[in-house]
Amino acid sequence: FNERIVASLKEKGLDYYSFYTYDTGLLSKHPITDSLTVFPENGDHGSIYRLTSSVNGHKVAVYTSHLDYLDCAYYNVRGYDGSSWKEIPIPTTVEEVLKVNVASQRDDAIKMFIAQAQKDIANGYSVIIGGDFNEPSHLDWIEANKNLYDHNGLVIPWTVTTLLEQNGFVDTYRHIYPNPLTHPGFTYPADNPL
């Protein structure tokens, strides 16, 4: 897929670079100096890939993630099993939600990203991660909105974004729009009719 995009852009006179990835992709306007599979796709439990490049003499490491879609506990909070999508009783405690959430491999993948990213930072790279975490941000599930957006009274320290924040990463959306009441950040399926 990535090769076709690069070839199509080339036909239009645009030079872009990419490398093989299984279920996500990275395109770069700048030549790629290295690429790496950080968390390999295995049994449809997500993946993380990394490229390094130089932008105006500055070293950057860019990661793409498509984390495990199973055990998506934000569905559980809304009365649906996060793996089968069948109706279930709505959990009433944060502990119930997080027990389901950590059954996924999202936390394993993000820990592998953090370990690699720390090496990149130590080697002078600026690090950027994007993609589909298949999990909300803990910065969007706070006391002020616990009774909005089907949060059902819960304030949840979602695992992936909590780990990222604890390791010095910044949620850029929340940095630009710090108020989740005026600028809510939603996670929902791409095929949602809204």
Predicted regions and their residues:
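A solvent-exposed, charged loop/short amphipathic helix patch at secondary-structure junctions
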Residues: 75-103, 144-147, 151
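Generic detector of contiguous secondary-structure segments
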Residues: 41-54, 111-121, 125-127, 155, ...
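Charged/polar, solvent-exposed surface patches and flexible loops
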Residues: 7, 11, 115, 162-166
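Structured beta-strand-rich core segments of catalytic domains in phosphoester-bond hydrolases
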Residues: 2-81
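Active-site beta-strand/loop signature of hydrolases that rely on acidic residues for catalysis
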Residues: 1-3, 62-65, 99-144, 172
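Active site of divalent-metal-dependent phosphoester/diester hydrolases
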Residues: 15-28, 108, 119, 137-194
